[in-house]
Amino acid sequence: MEAAADSPAETRSRVEKDSRRVEKDSRRPKKDSPAKTQSPAQDTSIMLRNNADTGKVLALPEHKKKRKGYLPAESVKILRRWMYKHRFRAYPSEAEKRMLSKKTNLSLSQISNWFINARRRILPDMLQRRGNDRIVGHKTGKDANATHLQSTDASVPAKSGPRGSDNVQSLPLRSSPKGQMSGEKIPEPGSAPSQKLTMIAQPKKKVKVSNITSSSSPEPVSTEEYADFSSFQLLVDAAVQRAAELELEKKQESNP
């Protein structure tokens, strides 16, 4: 009955009020969910973080695989030192393995495996680098001694050779035939026998010296030296003949 009693003007006013309320509600900002209100940049950063986390998770097993089988550097140094000291017998006994395991904090199986690999890879380089192989060193020592002896044997004639050549070269300077050939006077008949003996004795001594030098030195004596000795012998013979002639002349004069 009340609705029927309402005038059309009142109904119109109510409708207008309802329409205004609807417009106001439409003009007000709507409260969206937090996922919808985020910007695209924030969305990309979240995606990158998620990918990085997954990459780290995937990379952990590979990192563990790479480090698997590697021993600590300090323990490897200790094992290398022991191998270098015992490089000619790189087979540790059980007691030595226990001692090394205490020093390196490694198990006996790890130490034995390391030595098996090191004997194939590290030990040959140690021996070649240092040259400490006993057989090779023994041979090289013998070769060095042989070469040393050869060098000393070769140095003996080399040292004695120049001395012999000096003696041979000094002989003509001390000898007198060149002076006689250059124009010196023949000795007087009174002193001829004594000079004759000295002159005959001198070539013998000189010949002996020349023989010694020729045997000690490898260089042969030249033929010019023999020519000088032959001319000297001729001069000696001439002097002897002249002295004999002078003695005969004196005897003839003393016994007319």
UniProtKB/Swiss-Prot annotation:
Spell out the Polar residues composition-biased ranges: 35-45, 166-179
State the residue spans of region: Disordered. 1-45, 136-224
DNA-binding region coordinates: 62-125
Q: What is its main location?
A: nucleus
**Annotated InterPro entries:** HD, Homeodomain-like_sf, KN_HD, TALE_homeobox
Which locations, inside or outside the cell, does it occupy? Nucleus
Any idea which UniProt keywords this protein has? DNA-binding, Homeobox, Nucleus, Transcription, Transcription regulation
SUPFAM superfamilies per record = Homeodomain-like
Pfam families cross-referenced by the UniProt entry: Homeobox_KN
Composition bias type Basic and acidic residues, residue spans: 9-34
Q: Which SMART domains match?
A: HOX
A GO cellular component annotated for this chain's UniProt record is: nucleus
Biological process, per Gene Ontology: regulation of DNA-templated transcription
Which one of the record's GO molecular function terms can you name? DNA binding
Low complexity bias: start-end ranges: 209-224
Family designation: Belongs to the TALE/TGIF homeobox family.
What does this protein's UniProt record list under function?
May have a transcription role in testis.
Q: What is the name of the protein in this document?
A: Homeobox protein TGIF2LX
Organism the protein comes from: Papio hamadryas (Hamadryas baboon)
